[in-house]
Structure formats: structure tokens, C-alpha cells
């Protein structure tokens, strides 16, 4: 019974992830591991780490380029439990709303702070991007964002040129 509920929940989360334009545009998803639902109760934490380079899914290995945490519980339902991402000498703490997600390079050192009250419920997954290099992926994402923001403010010819550059870079940088 629990396995069936878990599989159904994981399927719903995977479908939501694939339907999210922001996630698709940022991650350039090739494939990803089925979401794993994680429950943290008081005194539970997950120490500093970077995620593994590969994740086994059934009989195949998926390269982990991007890690994704999907928040399943409202932040008011628990205390502590922040996802803390270490970016050089800066630290970013995230405690997202239910249904929100945070994506970050799997090479990033991060941790989950101790839950002090209530229950933290999240799903995690690992995305294999079509573009391995995070800097190239970020450049292409930024280029596409600028093109989308400019929209009809630029001439048709320049839109076509931007689309050509974007598609060419995507093709050149893809695995």
C-alpha cells in the first residue's frame, strides 16, 4: 500500500517537474531520477556534502548535473530544516513554500539544517542535463531569457538570429 502511494506521489512530482517551463528552460532536462520523498523529524539533519556524480536508476546510471529539492510542506509547519547552499564565501538558506522547488548544480556543497519542531517533507531528484557544463548551461539560459524578455521589442530578423544562435549553441554544447 505504501509503495503504491509512494510510486504515485513520485509520478505526480515527476510530471509536475516536466510540465514546469522554468525548470525545463533552466535545466535543459535530458532525463532525471524519480523523485525521492524525504521526511525530516525533530533533530534530523543532513550534513554538508556535494551530491554524487551519478545516480543509479534501475539498470542504468544517470549523471547528476543538477540537484532539485521540491518542498512538500508549508514552511510554517516546521522550524529549522533550511536547505543551506554554500556558494564560495556566501551561504544561501532556503525554506520554500509547498510546491516550490530549488535547483542548483550537483557539485554545490549544501546541507539540511536540523529540524527543531514539526516535520520537513521534501522530494529530491537529480537531473541529467543536455548540457553538462554549468557555465555553458547558464549562458544559454540567460540568452534565452533575454530573447524572451525582448519578445516583440526587436525586429523579426533579430529574433530569428537570436533563435539561430540559441539553437546552434544548444546543439553544439549538448551531450
Task: Outline where the language-model segments fall.
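Fe(II)/2-oxoglutarate oxygenase catalytic core
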Residues: 1-101, 107, 113-175
Amino acid at each position: 500500500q505504501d509503495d503504491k502511494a509512494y510510486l504515485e506521489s513520485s509520478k505526480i512530482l515527476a510530471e509536475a517537474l516536466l510540465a514546469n517551463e522554468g525548470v525545463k528552460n533552466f535545466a535543459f532536462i535530458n532525463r532525471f531520477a524519480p523523485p525521492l520523498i524525504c521526511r525530516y523529524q525533530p533533530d534530523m539533519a543532513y550534513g554538508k556534502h556535494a551530491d554524487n556524480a551519478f545516480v543509479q536508476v534501475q539498470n542504468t546510471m544517470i549523471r547528476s548535473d543538477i540537484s532539485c529539492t521540491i518542498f512538500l510542506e508549508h514552511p510554517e509547519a516546521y522550524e529549522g530544516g533550511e536547505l543551506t547552499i554554500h556558494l564560495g564565501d556566501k551561504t544561501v538558506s532556503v525554506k520554500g513554500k509547498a510546491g516550490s522547488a530549488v535547483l542548483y548544480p550537483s557539485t554545490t556543497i549544501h546541507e539540511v539544517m536540523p529540524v527543531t519542531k514539526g516535520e520537513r517533507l521534501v522530494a529530491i531528484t537529480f537531473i541529467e542535463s543536455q548540457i553538462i557544463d554549468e557555465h555553458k548551461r547558464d549562458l544559454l539560459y540567460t540568452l534565452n531569457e533575454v530573447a524572451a524578455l525582448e519578445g516583440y521589442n526587436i525586429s523579426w530578423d533579430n529574433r530569428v538570429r537570436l533563435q539561430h544562435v540559441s539553437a546552434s549553441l544548444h546543439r553544439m554544447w549538448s551531450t
